[in-house]
Amino acid sequence: MDKSSGELVTLTPNNNNTVQPVALMRLGVFVPTLKSLKNSKKNTLSRTDATEELTRLSLARAEGFDKVEITGPRLDMDNDFKTWVGIIHSFARHNVIGDKVELPFVEFAKLCGIPSSQSSRRLRERISPSLKRIAGTVISFSRTDEKHTREYITHLVQSAYYDTERDIVQLQADPRLFELYQFDRKVLLQLKAINALKRRESAQALYTFIESLPRDPAPISLARLRARLNLKSPVFSQNQTVRRAMEQLREIGYLDYTEIQRGRTKFFCIHYRRPRLKAPNDESKENPLQPSPAEKVSPEMAEKLALPEKLGITLDDLEKLFKSR
């Protein structure tokens, strides 16, 4: 529902956009490929605490689960994210029988953004590894008390079957997770920006995160954007990656921003977002945010403000702490 008008808005995927669950976009399930050979060969298992977002699912509420964790191989932006887009499109556009959907393999490849001109072998080489990684991503719901533990373990996709000779793909989802595929807090993700950022995975990942934020978002800390990318390089190198990705988002016309500093913490103020990569007819609807001037703080206060970052404590950590009180 559009809060400003009260109008019910239906979000429908097509070739230019996809409906993505906000949780997966904010949590960093899809991240840039680790570029260095050293990092790409080790620590490729990703572990994400999804408690805050996914305990809102009816499965978690009904069973009283209070902890949700997503584990599995790192899912990249260049191939895995596009395959996930194809999966979302498949369930949205085709008849779901029970917990399965079936469609032509060539059509599934198109939904994944792969040109139909590519050979069958190249299609398999791109789709097969991504399906394996996505199907290998585990979502666990659990609750532990002093004496007992209760846990439900499932996968992002339960199974995938394809036969290029028969030209079919069959995808199976956990019925108890259909709500995740059709989460009520969704955004319409324009694929135009993703396509304009080919091979710029860090910019793609930040795009999916920023586009999931509500209208007129608060300033986003540099530390939060680093966390979204989930890189393994030194912090100064990660900062460079974030700034380069933000500049790439500005270059394609998606957003404009100002980087500011409060105390020792860096923030990005987003002035507007344009997922269609062009200005709207009425630019006043963008409600641009003006950057807040840097406040003068005493050396003592500046030292206190810098302490959480030194300890590796993010704004999300502090927010969770205050909510738990």
Curated annotation (Swiss-Prot):
GO terms for biological process: DNA replication initiation; plasmid maintenance. Residues 279-300 are annotated as: Disordered. This protein is essential for plasmid replication; it is involved in copy control functions. In vitro, binds to the DNA repeat units, BCDD'D'', EFG and HIJ. One of its GO terms (molecular function) is DNA-directed DNA polymerase activity. This is RepFIB replication protein A. Belongs to the initiator RepB protein family. Gene3D superfamilies: Winged helix-like DNA-binding domain superfamily/Winged helix DNA-binding domain. It comes from the Bacteria. The keyword DNA-binding applies. InterPro entries: Initiator_Rep_WH1, WH-like_DNA-bd_sf. Keywords: DNA replication, DNA-binding, Plasmid, Plasmid copy control. The keyword Protease does not apply.
